[in-house]
């Protein structure tokens, strides 16, 4: 969902919803990899029934990762995707269902955002190439050093769109992967696997929600099914709440801000391309022996417990003395609806509502104030009561003027504080050019800050040595420039791997021009004139914008609770109206057009692709994007404006692209449809979901019999054979059958010669037109035990926050007291000294452990290694004066001191007294 910072706001406001995943790792014995046994109980101390994968959130980081080298070719990409799924399966360990959903053709309402994102990606790619070429030339002219430019084909991530050859190949690879795992992995033997590839219309997460909704409506559904959905989009939280399932958990990668990214020219971290000076790479180790050996920190996962979020919301939304009965489930639906106003994938957010300014808290406060007047809830089962919504919007509209003025004041205060900070930094630079660093650096009296945790011994030791070398070199250089004096002003020879600009340079960045000036009188007139090019007195136009936005609110809520109400509807403007414009909206919406159909895959490609990605389309189709004689050439501008809309960065702005006219697009494509090959026609057709299972599953014999009798009629699934799951089965056109070899589409992987899996087409159970899925707790649903404690309601109560590991709040977790943390502060120095010992040519001892890569150590003395799992033992041991080193056995890449406490056991190394 297009709500920047939504998850950050949510996790800060409701911190107990987050649980860190416990992940068992496979082992290696004599060069043989031993995988994790996923048949064993889940180490997170919870058992999940169904795991749903929003596959696009997996495909993108596996094909073009940001924090490690990209795969060399498509085969490596497929293997990376398989490994990612394996890792998630290992953490979650579903016992009934694995559902993999790839984005298919999206509703027209989503295509606006998809089009903007793909045009931006193409534009940024061209600008990046130009910038790299320009900066490279400048650096070389100044005598800088840059590694030779690699000539390699750039991976166009736009190919991750339905209808491309890449997505078709991915579907084939996933079919192979599922067959291989069902045949060879014991943890898969009793689960049903659903694959909804890119040929099936719908966004991945909404195909998953549609599956859950339709299964909930069946009489055999288990109301206490424990769902786990994988995905990083913020809208998954709202979608999970909208199911009203009591046991719903989301798993996602843990977001770590400010992760270093290598420069695209020199490959070093700490600066961007525009600031590259072509400095030679420093040696990693005395003889560069550590170059290319530093392992990248593995991405960690977290759980988001929606049952705990429901606890928070129950406390926040409960209202007394209402003129109608309080219904918590209805209030949750209203909360989800109010979140739409701060942004989503289908509508721009209202100008006065910014998530970073506490917009949701403001809306909830207004909601609770006016609910006595509204006489009821805002929504019911995905349908909106517009008369009540208008009262909320009018209350927001009254405050709009103050909101805009406060926003301006906050911005000015922020700039003022930054300016003062830069002045302080400049004053500090006037001090001595050489200061003692490390353990002998001066510290303020009484400072009790805990030291950083050791993340990777070898890596950090190298960093320490490089930093101390650089400090010494800079100090010497400054003293020489200053004629031997020990103090000097700021030097131009600052470290090129740090901040590349002087502190004052940021003042020279031009402020984006804001012609609207929402904080000044006349803001509404200027807004409509600048954004819509109409006079603010044009009431008919403003009403048209509001009506479209109201339709959008109704469409989005229906999409979340009932499915796609219209494949054709979309919001036809780049900007939203003001809250104060929502007047007399009760009769602005009646219903959507019935029986609309989605685009076909190649048609959607024509609607969302820029001309630069035309190579993924048939030749005559791509000519429509570039030929001057094309009747739709105006859909594909080579360049386009980006309106910052009051923001600072281009990625936050609004891409001013022309909207695609569906009628004109279809008319132009009618002339080139006959040019499609049979393969292109197949890729342009709509497909269906496929169900897979292994030989030991109770449903296996039933499906095998369908193939034996060649039954072409749809057959209902016997619910008793499949955990209550219902739907219709049809024979697959290219089936995976037992005893048939499944060929590997990836050359580096082996064929499945003794396949025991079987696959069949699957269709969700149908419902009559006009059927309404009830947004309620199902009969028999058991509410999970409450998790929150009284202290969890007090924010900033002074207690140290410790993240929970796994679902058991009473899990034994080792932690260190203050003396232990002080000892950890000297780990860097200790390892630094070990690694820098000049080893003789005699026999060297290798110290190996899973926490850190092996490195040579001169045997100075013998060490005794003790492993403790008792908190009491650790506290005692940490106080022992002979402690040399303490660090975590597991999760050594943890990034903050607070994270240390969640890992056990702890490794303590003492010098032996023998």
Stretch-by-stretch model annotation:
Residues 828-830, 849, 861, 873, ...:
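Low-complexity, intrinsically disordered or signal/transmembrane-proximal segments
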Residues 879, 902, 908-911:
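Compositionally biased, intrinsically disordered low-complexity segments enriched in Pro/Arg/Gln/His
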Residues 1-827:
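Noncatalytic, typically N-terminal accessory segments of nucleic acid-processing enzymes
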Residues 839, 862, 867-869, 876-877, ...:
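Ala/Thr-enriched low-complexity intrinsically disordered regions
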Residues 54, 844, 854, 874, ...:
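Low-complexity, intrinsically disordered segments with a bias for serine/threonine
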Residues 827-834, 841-846, 865-869:
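Intrinsically disordered, low-complexity terminal segments enriched in Ser/Thr
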């Amino acid at each position: 969902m297009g709500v920047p910072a939504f998850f950050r706001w949510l996790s800060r406001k409701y911190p107990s919803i987050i649980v860190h995943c416990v992940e068992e790792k496979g082992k290696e014995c004599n060069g043989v990899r031993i995988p994790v046994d996923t048949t064993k109980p889940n180490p997170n101390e919870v058992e999940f029934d169904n795991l749903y994968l929003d596959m696009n959130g997996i495909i993108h980081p596996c094909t073009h990762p940001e924090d490690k080298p990209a795969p060399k070719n498509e085969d490596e990409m497929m293997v990376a995707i398989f490994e990612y799924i394996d890792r998630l399966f290992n953490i979650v360990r579903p016992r009934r269902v694995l559902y993999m959903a790839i984005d298919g053709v999206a509703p027209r309402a989503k295509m606006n955002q998809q089009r903007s994102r793909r045009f931006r990606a193409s534009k940024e790619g061209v600008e990046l190439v130009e910038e790299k070429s320009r900066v490279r030339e400048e650096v070389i002219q100044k005598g800088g050093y840059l590694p030779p430019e690699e000539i390699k084909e750039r991976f166009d991530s736009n190919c991750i769109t339905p209808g491309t050859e890449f997505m078709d190949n991915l579907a084939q690879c996933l079919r192979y992967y599922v067959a291989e795992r069902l045949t060879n992995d014991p943890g898969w033997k009793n689960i049903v696997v659903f694959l909804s590839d890119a040929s099936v219309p719908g966004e991945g997460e909404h195909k998953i929600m549609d599956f859950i909704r339709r299964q909930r409506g069946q009489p055999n559904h288990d109301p206490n099914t424990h769902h786990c959905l994988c995905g990083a989009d913020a809208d998954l939280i709202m979608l999970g709440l909208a199911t009203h399932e009591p046991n719903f958990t989301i798993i996602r990668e843990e977001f770590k801000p400010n992760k270093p990214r290598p420069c695209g020219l020199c490959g070093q971290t700490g600066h961007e391309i525009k600031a590259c000076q072509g400095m030679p790479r420093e040696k990693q180790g005395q003889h560069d022996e550590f170059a290319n050996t530093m392992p990248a920190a593995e991405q960690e996962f977290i759980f988001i417990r929606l049952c705990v979020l429901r606890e928070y919301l129950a406390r926040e939304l409960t209202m007394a003395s209402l003129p109608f009965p309080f219904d918590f489930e209805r209030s949750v639906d209203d909360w989800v609806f109010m979140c739409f106003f701060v942004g989503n994938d289908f509508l721009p957010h209202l100008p006065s509502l910014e998530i970073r300014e506490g917009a949701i808290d403001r809306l909830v406060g207004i909601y609770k104030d006016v609910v006595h007047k509204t006489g009821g809830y805002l929504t019911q089962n995905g349908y909106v009561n517009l008369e009540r919504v208008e009262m909320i919007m009018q209350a927001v509209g009254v405050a709009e003027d103050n909101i805009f003025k406060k926003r301006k004041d906050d911005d000015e205060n922020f700039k003022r504080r930054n300016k003062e900070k830069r002045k302080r930094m400049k004053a500090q630079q006037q001090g001595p050019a050489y200061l003692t660093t490390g353990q002998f650096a001066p510290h303020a009296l009484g400072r009790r800050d805990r030291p950083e945790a050791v993340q990777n011994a070898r890596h950090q030791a190298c960093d320490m040595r490089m930093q101390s070398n650089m400090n010494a070199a800079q100090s010497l250089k400054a003293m020489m420039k200053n004629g031997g004096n020990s103090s000097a002003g700021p030097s131009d020879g600052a470290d090129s791997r740090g901040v590349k600009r002087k502190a004052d340079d940021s003042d020279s960045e031009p402020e984006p021009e804001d012609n609207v000036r929402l904080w000044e009188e006349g803001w509404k007139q200027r807004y409509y004139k600048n954004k819509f090019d109409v006079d603010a007195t044009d009431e008919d136009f403003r009403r048209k914008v509001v009506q479209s936005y109201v339709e959008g609110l109704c469409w989005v809520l229906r999409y979340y609770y009932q499915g796609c109400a219209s494949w054709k509807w979309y919001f036809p403007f780049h900007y939203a109206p003001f809250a104060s414009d929502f007047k007399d909206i009760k009769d602005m919406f009646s219903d959507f057009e019935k029986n609309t159909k989605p685009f076909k895959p190649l048609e959607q490609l024509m609607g969302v692709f820029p001309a630069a990605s035309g190579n993924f389309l048939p030749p005559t189709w791509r000519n429509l994007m570039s030929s001057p004689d094309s009747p739709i050439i105006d859909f594909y501008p080579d360049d386009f404006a980006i309106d910052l809309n009051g923001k600072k960065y281009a990625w936050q702005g609004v891409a001013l692209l022309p909207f695609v006219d569906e009628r004109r697009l279809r008319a132009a494509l009618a002339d080139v449809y006959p040019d499609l090959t049979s393969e292109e026609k197949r890729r342009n057709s709509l497909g269906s979901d496929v169900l897979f299972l292994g030989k030991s599953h109770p449903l296996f014999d039933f499906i095998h019999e369908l193939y034996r009798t060649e039954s072409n009629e749809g057959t209902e699934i016997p619910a008793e054979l499949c955990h209550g799951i219902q739907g219709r089965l049809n024979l697959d056109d290219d089936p995976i059958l037992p005893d048939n070899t499944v060929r590997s589409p990836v050359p580096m992987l082996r064929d499945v010669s003794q396949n025991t899996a079987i696959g069949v087409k699957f269709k969700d159970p149908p419902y009559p037109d006009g059927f309404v899925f009830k947004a309620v707790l199902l009969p028999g649903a058991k509410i999970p035990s409450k998790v929150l404690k009284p202290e969890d309601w007090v924010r900033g109560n002074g207690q140290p926050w410790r993240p929970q590991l796994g679902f058991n709040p009473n899990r034994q977790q080792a932690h260190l007291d203050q003396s232990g943390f002080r000892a950890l502060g000297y780990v860097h120095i200790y390892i630094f000294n070990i690694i820098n010992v000049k080893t003789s040519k005699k026999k060297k001892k290798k110290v190996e452990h899973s926490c850190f890569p092996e490195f040579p150590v001169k045997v100075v003395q013998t060490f005794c290694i003790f492993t403790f799992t008792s908190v009491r033992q650790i506290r005692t041991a940490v106080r022992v004066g002979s402690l040399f080193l303490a660090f975590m056995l597991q999760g050594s890449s943890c990034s903050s001191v607070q994270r240390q406490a969640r890992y056990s056991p702890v490794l303590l190394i003492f010098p032996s007294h023998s």
